[in-house]
């Protein structure tokens, strides 16, 4: 049952189209996944998922919900991210290029951040921020699972970031917290949480977040604002008010045939260009309700230069581990937080004073004069000389993911793989492989 106030508003806005809109709520949910470009070595078969392309996302696919791809070892290895198809649109509109500096300001749980990272292909810097500490941990875990090496995951208030990163980013995504009306079909909580004053409350918060984002974008940079709501107050209304207050921003006109135009006639005193924003309607495409606006800041200046984070010296234990295993590293510089070593992009600015959950690629920790590699490094690695591979259906693979030791004559640190995908570490003593798959991720056989 839709909230009465919501239904009345949508009936008035959509007129004769309201019947089709209402009927879309009885349609089966669209389930989607997005392939991870960073996992190019995959040799397995995904045909059982009955994949069909998502028109607006080259790496996006609809899948048969009964196939349950989230239970496959391929999901654990970061081959794909399960994501609602319409939610794939904002990152495609932002379209970051390898080498750019990109900010995802409201990033949890990580669907759009992992999509942006896939476009950067390990080059440049991606800063992912989430103000909610619990959700920020989920974000960090998803960045790890997909093998992303050039991201800084933060748990900060947007205003604090504005003070640190003025004019620093080439591109910014603001997937703003909203009333969630586009998720009514998918999440019952979105329906029960809705109230008549929800839209205005959300719009005020969205304008504050946009103001913070604007100060971090370089002149000439691109900003995408998106929501998963139908509310004109939170969509065209927010963008219109932002544009009137920030004349150095304008709406970019992009040709995207899959989406419907924004509706300047639904808000008072509309700013120029609202018709070039985008609405995704569940009765017009296979996906949930979304809105997106692509904004450009006037000018053309290089991103601001910030003091770099100083590099740390490589501990001898890490050097010895690499000498023994031949484990590759991405380009970058070494950082140490206590006993833990990270490899981060060279351009990473100073992070002192920020709540950092993840910096680049976690390599591992120096413990009692030895080096123990991190799970994140295993997921980033494409290959290792000392590795063992199992087919997806091999019972030994299920045993590994459950935390069991495995019979093996191998010695030393060993990379466990399936069909060209790395899953984690094990350590052999000549008789068996001791399991180093993280306990929090283990699943019963």
Predicted regions and their residues:
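Polybasic, low-complexity RNA-engagement segments
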Residues: 1-45, 288-291, 298-445
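Conserved AdoMet
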Residues: 31-88
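Conserved class I S-adenosyl-L-methionine
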Residues: 99-108
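Conserved SAM-binding loop of SAM-dependent methyltransferases across substrates and taxa
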Residues: 109-122
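Helix-to-beta-strand junctions that scaffold the AdoMet/dcAdoMet cofactor pocket
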Residues: 121, 217-219
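S-adenosyl-L-methionine
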Residues: 129-167
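Mobile active-site "lid"/loop adjacent to the S-adenosyl-L-methionine
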Residues: 134, 171-211, 228-235, 257, ...
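Class I S-adenosyl-L-methionine
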Residues: 169, 222-225, 230-342
């Amino acid at each position: 049952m839709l909230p009465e106030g919501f239904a009345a508003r949508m009936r008035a806005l959509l007129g004769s189209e309201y019947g089709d809109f209402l009927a879309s709520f009885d349609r089966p949910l669209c389930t989607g996944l997005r392939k991870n470009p960073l996992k190019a070595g995959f040799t397995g078969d995904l045909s059982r998922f009955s994949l069909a392309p998502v028109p607006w996302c080259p790496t996006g696919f609809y899948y048969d919900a009964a196939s349950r791809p989230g239970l496959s070892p391929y999901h654990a290895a970061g081959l794909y991210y399960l994501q609602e198809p319409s939610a794939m649109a904002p990152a495609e509109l932002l379209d970051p290029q390898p080498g750019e500096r990109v900010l995802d300001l409201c990033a949890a749980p990580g669907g759009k951040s992992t999509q942006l990272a896939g476009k950067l292909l390990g080059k440049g810097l991606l800063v992912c921020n989430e103000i909610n500490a619990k959700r920020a941990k989920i974000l960090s875990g998803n960045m790890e699972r997909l093998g992303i090496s050039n991201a800084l995951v933060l748990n900060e208030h947007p205003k604090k970031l504005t003070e640190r990163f003025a004019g620093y980013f080439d591109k910014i995504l603001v997937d703003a917290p909203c009333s969630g009306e586009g998720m009514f079909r998918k999440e019952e909580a979105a329906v029960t949480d809705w109230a008549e004053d929800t839209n205005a409350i959300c719009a005020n918060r969205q304008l504050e977040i946009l103001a913070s984002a604007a100060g971090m974008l370089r002149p000439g940079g691109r900003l995408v604002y998106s929501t998963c709501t139908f509310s004109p107050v939170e969509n065209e209304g927010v963008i219109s008010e932002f544009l009137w207050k920030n004349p150095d921003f304008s709406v970019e006109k992009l040709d995207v045939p899959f989406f419907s135009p924004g509706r300047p006639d639904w808000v008072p005193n509309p700013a120029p260009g609202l018709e070039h924003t985008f609405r995704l309607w569940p009765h017009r495409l296979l996906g949930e309700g979304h809105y997106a606006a692509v904004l450009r800041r006037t000018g053309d200046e290089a991103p601001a230069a910030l003091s770099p984070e100083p590099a740390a010296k490589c501990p001898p234990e890490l050097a010895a581990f690499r000498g023994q295993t031949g484990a590759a590293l991405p380009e970058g510089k070494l950082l140490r937080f206590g006993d833990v070593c990270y490899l981060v992009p060279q351009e990473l600015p100073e992070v002192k004073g920020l709540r950092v959950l993840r910096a680049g690629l976690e390599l591992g920790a120096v413990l009692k004069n030895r080096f123990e590699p991190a799970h994140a490094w295993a997921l980033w690695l494409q290959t290792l000389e000392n590795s063992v591979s199992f087919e997806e259906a091999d019972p030994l693979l299920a045993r590994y993911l459950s935390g069991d030791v495995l019979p093996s004559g191998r010695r030393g640190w060993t990379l466990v793989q399936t069909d060209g995908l790395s899953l984690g570490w094990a350590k052999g003593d000549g008789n068996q492989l001791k399991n180093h798959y993280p306990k929090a991720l283990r699943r019963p056989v």
